[in-house]
Amino acid sequence: MSTIKTLAISGAVYGVYRGVKKALDSTVDQADYMARTIYGEARGEGARGMQAVANVIMNRVKKNGWYGASIKDVVLKPWQFSCWNDNDKNSSIIKQANAAQLKQAREIADKVISGELPDITGGATHYYASSIKAPVWTKTMNKTATIGNHYFYA
């Protein structure tokens, strides 16, 4: 077989592999980003608290505007989910978390993404912890739920 033919076949196979891998990675990445976010934001809130944060992420994705068009876009948007801020104590925790640590968060993320778990926040796109002063944006939004130590707004 000629070198050119070998390179052409190899390139085609690699291109197909790369396309499939990219598609798989994007699906896996979306759930991983959600799992890491809900772990970082609500791991002390139990399953219901993590589900609520996952619901906020999906509600923002569904809005498909300023927030971003994908889970990854939404959670990595600067200053939206504090666990991704470089100066946040949770940033290193979520980036280093292993599969065992993320197990419950990943299960919740997968179920929220698939629609198996409903939105328990009343369509919330925002939330904040009860331990901090109410952000200014709460004045222009409606409170939809209190779940654990978080207040949710739409």
Task: Please state what every model-predicted region is.
Residues D25-A154:
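Bacterial extracytoplasmic/cell-wall-associated proteins, especially those involved in peptidoglycan
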Residues S2-K22:
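Single-pass alpha-helical membrane anchors
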